[in-house]
Design a protein with these regions (language model features):
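Hydrophobic anchor residue at the start of the ABC signature
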Residues: 168
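Catalytic Walker B motif of ABC-type/P-loop ATPase nucleotide-binding domains
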Residues: 179-183
Length: 275
C-alpha cells in the first residue's frame, strides 16, 4: 500500500458548473491542484474566478460536476475546511481588531486546540500548555514572514502589506495541506508583490509543513512567477491551461485580455482585471 501523501492535498474539479438562475457563472470547469504544486487561476473581469474560489471553499454549491480530495468525493463546507487540512485567505484581511497580531495568528489554530486559545477567548476552561504552544508557533510564523516585530501591535496600526502577511500566518498556523489564496496581491505595491511572490514560492517546501496551493489572482506578473501550472477562465469556461510559458503564448489568452485585434506577439498585461 502506498504511504499517504505528506506534501499536500490532491484537489480535483471535474466538469463543474454553476448557474444563478439563467446566468452561467462556471461552465464545465475541470482542473487539478496536484500535491506540492502551485496552480494559478486567472482571467479577465467577470471570468468566474471568484465563483470558482467560492465553490472550493463551500460558499457556492456547484450546479453540476464534482470535486475530489486525494481521489475521494469532496463536498466543501466552510466550517469543515480546516479539519480536512484546508486553509484560506480572503481578499480582505479580516483580522480581529480587538486582538494583537500574535493573538490573531493564534486564532487560526483554534480548531486543533481542544482546550486552548479558543477557550480563553470565550471564557471557557483552557490549557495553559496549549496556549503557550500556540503562541510560540505563532511567533515563529510571524518571524518566518518577516513581521515578528509587530507581534504585540493591534492590526489597525499596521500597513496593509503587513496585515496581509499576518493573515497568511493565520492560515499557515492551521498546518494546511491545501492553501487557498484569494487575490493576495490586491492593494499591494510592486515591491510588496515581489516579496509576496518569494514567500509564496517557498510555501510548498517549507519546513513547517508542505502544502498544495491554489492561487486565484488578477496580477499576471505574480501568477507567472510563482505558479507551476495556470488555468485561464473567460466567461466561466477554461480557455487555456498549462505552464506559465504555454499560457503566455496562447492566442486565446491574449485575445481574452486584450481583444481580438491585437498585434502578433502581444502578451497579457501585468495587473490584469478583476474577478
Amino acid at each position: 500500500m502506498s504511504p499517504p501523501p505528506t506534501d499536500g492535498i490532491d484537489l480535483a474539479l471535474q466538469h463543474v458548473g454553476v448557474r444563478f438562475g439563467g446566468l452561467v457563472a462556471l461552465d464545465d470547469v475541470s482542473l487539478r491542484v496536484p500535491p506540492g504544486r502551485i496552480v494559478g487561476v486567472i482571467g479577465p473581469n467577470g471570468a468566474g474566478k471568484t465563483t470558482l474560489f467560492n465553490v472550493v471553499c463551500g460558499f457556492v454549491p456547484p450546479t453540476s460536476g464534482s470535486l475530489t480530495l486525494d481521489g475521494r468525493p469532496f463536498r466543501p463546507r466552510p466550517h469543515r475546511l480546516t479539519r480536512l487540512g484546508i486553509a484560506r485567505t480572503l481578499q480582505g484581511v479580516g483580522l480581529f481588531p480587538g486582538l494583537s497580531v500574535v493573538e490573531n495568528v493564534m486564532a487560526g489554530a483554534t480548531h486543533s486546540a481542544r482546550a486552548g486559545f479558543a477557550a480563553a477567548l470565550f471564557g471557557l476552561p483552557r490549557s495553559d500548555r496549549d496556549e503557550r504552544r500556540l503562541r510560540h508557533e505563532a511567533l515563529g510564523l510571524l518571524a518566518e514572514l518577516g513581521v515578528a516585530a509587530h507581534a504585540a501591535a493591534p492590526p489597525a496600526t499596521l500597513p496593509y502589506a503587513v496585515r496581509k502577511r499576518v493573515a497568511l500566518a493565520r492560515a499557515l498556523i492551521a498546518r494546511p495541506r491545501l492553501l487557498l489564496l484569494d487575490e493576495p496581491a490586491g492593494g499591494l505595491s510592486a515591491e510588496d508583490i515581489t516579496e509576496l511572490g518569494e514567500l509564496v514560492t517557498a510555501l510548498p517546501d517549507r519546513a513547517g509543513g508542505a502544502c498544495s496551493i491554489m492561487l486565484v489572482e488578477h496580477h499576471m506578473d505574480l501568477v507567472m512567477s510563482v505558479c507551476h501550472e495556470i488555468v485561464v477562465l473567460d466567461f466561466g469556461r477554461v480557455i487555456a491551461a498549462g505552464t506559465p510559458e504555454q499560457v503566455r503564448d496562447d492566442p486565446l489568452v491574449t485575445e481574452a485580455y486584450l481583444g481580438a485585434d491585437v498585434p502578433a506577439g502581444a502578451t497579457p498585461p501585468g495587473p490584469g482585471a478583476g474577478s
